[in-house]
Amino acid sequence: MFNEIKDFAAPELDVYARTSEVQLLRYYEPEPGIFIAESPKVIERALKAGYQPISFLVEHKDLEGEAQEILKQYPDVPGYTAEYELLVKLTGFALTRGMLCAMRRNPLPSVEEICRNVSRIAVLENVVNPTNIGDIFRSAAALHMDAVLLTGGCSDPLYRRAARVSMGTVFQIPWTYFNKKNVWPQDGMQILQNLGFKTAAMALRDDSVGIDDKALRSEEKLAVILGPEGDGLASQIIADCDYTVKIPMSHGVDSLNVAAASAVAFWELGHR
């Protein structure tokens, strides 16, 4: 049943208005917390992946729009509605396609579970920009990668902007973080090696091989490792990898942003 928003201070609206994403992440510690999914497409993909809705926040005009089919499936989940201007005032941002959903997080699988029976994985080191995270996940899902692993310094894939930019593909490709007890890169790289993966660092070095290198492309199990823009991958990681890989470029361009580079890398090295 939907309720017209009359009191911005109502506690049931706290998850949308007065709680940061970090606070939502830790909402039920030590149990998994909450995330906010934005737009009907993203919400629908989260629901199909088994995430449970807590409540909906929907712009008036969208109650009969794209949101309608989703809402019909969850008649017992609380819903709140108001005009666009009031929702912007409440949340502090412009809603994409007029719909938000607060959802419970699921427990994350282990790295070993994620990597079982897969041959191509993306490993992200300290990618902090949620837009880049979303773009990378979308490319990984579309371009034949089997899973994504993240170091603890990465932005959370379920943060609202990351999930929205990914178009919900964060719910379509398996992913997890390296365990906090594992020291990155020492323990993480050892885990990848123990799981049978050859490692490929995407980095511009004099000794880099081209992304079309035959030996690289023929590896049975390959982990493609990408780092943050600016500093790039740590030198220790590059030294520990089996390959250092570069993307050939023209017109004097010396680099691509990490999201663009990931798309090229996944297309060339993904399992297809």
Language-model features: locations:
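Glycine- and other small-residue-rich loops at beta-strand/loop junctions that grip anionic moieties
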Residues: 5, 35, 125-126, 151-152, ...
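Short, aromatic/basic amphipathic alpha-helical patches
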Residues: 65-76, 237
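RNA substrate-binding interface of SAM-dependent RNA methyltransferases
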Residues: 107-207
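Active-site/ligand-binding-proximal alpha/beta "capping" segment
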Residues: 200-252
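Glycine/small-residue-rich loop that forms an oxyanion/phosphate-binding "nest" at active or ligand-binding sites
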Residues: 71, 76-96
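Boundary-proximal intrinsically disordered activation/regulatory segments immediately upstream
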Residues: 1-66, 154-155
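Short acidic-hydrophobic, aromatic-tinged amphipathic segments that line or gate anion-handling sites
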Residues: 2-9, 78-83, 174-184, 245
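Structured adenosyl-cofactor binding patch, chiefly the S-adenosyl-L-methionine
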Residues: 99-101, 139-143, 157-171, 235-272
